[in-house]
């Protein structure tokens, strides 16, 4: 199915090639709004590696920075933001093999979440496709992901390997920073042509669980 999805819709004409990377790079700037020093990744094989996968769009395929799970295939990212976020979409990219995440479960506003807490019902869950080039976005149910100050991403399983490897996690949405006398809203979405939105090729590959 992945071959079918990549073969259609998103043409490789020079016009799209010139404009799309800049637009999508603007959309995925929410990583700048993460309180990175307080970000936690549970079950990472090396301390601090979980922070490395929240990086600029143009580094999304960089294979030098990644996180790998330790004791088993699960990972749990606890992501505090410096303000309030309305999350609209997520990209998660790994290796093109069995170590790629196969399912993620999203929780909001549960600081210091542990694996024991993952037994509760998530706000949303996705079955993933292998996406080594970070091309597939999974759209969130926006009504559930407004006013997010803390996001937890539970990688519950992969495609069969003993450990899971993640290279990039991209977050798209709006950020609201509260000041004493005003509120600044940063909308990380380019004014893109709907025809550029890969709807035809992405939709068949995005499976909602809940």
Swiss-Prot record:
Q: Where is the PITH domain?
A: 19-191
Kindly list the GO CC terms recorded for this protein: cytoplasm; nucleus
Q: Where in the cell is it found?
A: Cytoplasm
Keywords of the record, alphabetical order, are: Activator, Cytoplasm, Transcription, Transcription regulation
A biological process from GO: positive regulation of megakaryocyte differentiation
Report the domain of life of the source organism.
Answer: Eukaryota
Q: Does the keyword Ribonucleoprotein apply?
A: no
Q: Where is the secretion signal located?
A: none
Q: Which Pfam families match?
A: PITH
User: Does the entry feature the keyword Nucleotidyltransferase, yes or no?
Assistant: no
Q: Which PROSITE patterns match?
A: PITH
Family stated for the protein in its record? Belongs to the PITHD1 family.
> In UniProt terms, what function does this protein have?
May play a role in promoting megakaryocyte differentiation by up-regulating RUNX1 expression.
Protein's name in the database:
PITH domain-containing protein 1
Query: What organism is the protein native to?
Result: Danio rerio
| Source lineage | Eukaryota, Metazoa, Chordata, Craniata, Vertebrata
Q: Which gene encodes it?
A: pithd1
């Amino acid at each position: 199915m992945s071959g079918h999805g990549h073969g259609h819709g998103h043409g490789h004409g020079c016009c799209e090639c010139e404009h799309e990377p800049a637009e999508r790079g603007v959309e995925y700037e929410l990583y700048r709004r993460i309180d990175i020093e307080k970000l936690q990744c549970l079950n990472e094989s090396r301390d601090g590696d979980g922070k490395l996968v929240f990086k600029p769009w143009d580094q999304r395929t960089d294979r030098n920075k990644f996180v790998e799970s330790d004791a088993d295939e699960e990972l749990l990212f606890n992501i505090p933001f410096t303000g309030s976020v309305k999350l609209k979409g997520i990209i998660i990219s790994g290796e093109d093999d069995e170590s790629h995440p196969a399912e993620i479960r999203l929780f909001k506003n549960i600081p210091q979440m542990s694996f024991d807490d993952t037994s509760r019902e998530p706000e949303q869950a996705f079955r993933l496709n292998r996406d080594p080039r970070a091309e597939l976005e999974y759209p969130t149910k926006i009504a559930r992901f407004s006013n997010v100050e803390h996001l937890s991403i539970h990688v519950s399983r992969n495609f069969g390997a003993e450990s899971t490897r993640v290279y990039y996690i991209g977050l798209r949405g709006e950020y609201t920073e509260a000041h004493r006398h005003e509120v600044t809203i940063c909308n990380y979405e380019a004014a893109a042509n709907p025809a550029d939105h890969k709807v035809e090729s992405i939709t068949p590959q995005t499976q909602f669980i809940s």
